[in-house]
Amino acid sequence: VIAVAGAVDPAAGRHHQREAAEPVLPIATVAAALRQFDVRLDGIDIVSAATEPGRSIWVVLRMDPQRNVAAVAARDSLASTLAAATERLVHDLDGRHCQARPLNAAEITDMDAALLAGLDPDQIRPHWRYLKHPDGHVTSFWVSPPDITGDVLDELVLPDTDINVVTIRLVARRGGIDVSAIVRYHSDERLPKSVWGGLNRLTGRQLAAVRASLPVPAAGRPLLISSRSLGEDEDIVVRLAEAEPAAPTYSPAPVGTSL
């Protein structure tokens, strides 16, 4: 897992300095990391969590060791292989109008807690179109493939919700890369249709949608949603916060619980 934030411009404030470039995360740069020398990643998720204090963004690399036997053997362990792939992507991202750094195990646990946003699996009541819990409602939607653009991704952040979690999934396919996106809203009340009218319901798959945004793979069937091919000339970007990702304010779920 990689944490990404806007780069700090050392020349900021200098006289006659040109306006600094907007900090962004180019999806094409992330997608290129799906194929790295002898390593083939199954997918990469770009996960963002927007709250009132700010926005945190992470990049999650996913790899099937059975498809990378030679690479794992050459490095003696699965952990070393995935760490090498992560470091390569960090190198490609860091300094290009953004800061990138790999997370340690404790930080991944904090990320997991931040994305759950206080959800306790024991207190969730699943409904067909939303999840109910003591603090309100959690509702997930999938984005129509043609709508996966930079402008639409920016519009997914709603100011009247407690937290917005957007997951952009990049998956390697024969001959190309597929992109899909889901969004999750935490709110006090059920969301009116005027808010989500351009999105698609995940009927009966609300728990699976929450699992799909977490860094640690969950047991059970993966969430399958519609995707499209990512064009080689597409310049979709994710706008970044100009500061380091905010520290999570939520506590991890009790040990032994899972969604």
What are these regions (language model features)?
Residues R35-L41, D160-D162:
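Short secondary-structure junctions
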Residues L25, V39-D42, A74:
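Charged, elongated alpha-helical coiled-coil/linker "stalk" segments that transmit conformational signals
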Residues D42-V60, N68-A70:
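Structural flexibility/helix-modulation signal
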